[in-house]
Amino acid sequence: MFGALKKAFKAGAKEVQADYSHNKDYLEAVCAAAALVANADGEIEDSERSKVERVLSSHPVLSKMYQQNIIAQTAETMFKRAKDASGRQALARELDDIKGRDDGKMAEDVYLIALDVANADGELEPQEDAVLKKIAARLGVDPTRFEF
């Protein structure tokens, strides 16, 4: 009996390790989506950087999974990529990296964090809404499921 229990624990530990091996992709996808939303009007202002930093650092899951400096570094990398078309396409590819993982839950979480970033100032701009729709399409997420 204990041998079977030991095997079950080992198998569970391997699953947890497999889940954590994707964490870098998750953080990169979150920061890519946030950068795309922040750049919706074609430029990322200091206030938008602060808004993204505030949303990401206070997010209950992200703040437990990643150190603040890692979140900030990753976000800054994604902000730099958002400056031109090839960089924005690279950001879109970051979204592809998590599409379909965890039965789509990871993609939904990325979309919801992008929505939080867009709504952080209390106003969803038309450009931000358009980018959110593109993010949802890229992730294979139905945004109408989150209209609460």
Enumerate the predicted regions with their spans:
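Small-residue-enriched hydrophobic alpha-helices in membranes
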Residues: M1-L36, E43-F148
